[in-house]
């Protein structure tokens, strides 16, 4: 009998899951996320552009960008009637956040209440990734 823990043991904890986006230009994408969505660059490599990767943070939410020269994300939106999401970000203040970006050209779908109770809106970044911001509305 082994003394090693099982995969579901409480001492083996997953701390987070990080959506990872392939992009052609990590630096330009990181700047877009900072300017339009309030993310900050928590780290990047190497120390100067062109970066191979960057980690972006907004509160506890993290996104990772990985450089693939010439990469273009395929449009998967036609695979299901509701569209295709690349990341779902749960947040407090979703209504207030929506008001700060409302009417911008990167809004993919407006703030709506879903049948399951969440208020959500969608953003499409310059690389074609669709992020959903959802939570309780606070308007």
Please place each PLM-identified region on the residue numbering:
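Vicinal oxygen chelate
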Residues: 2-20, 31, 40-90, 98-124, ...
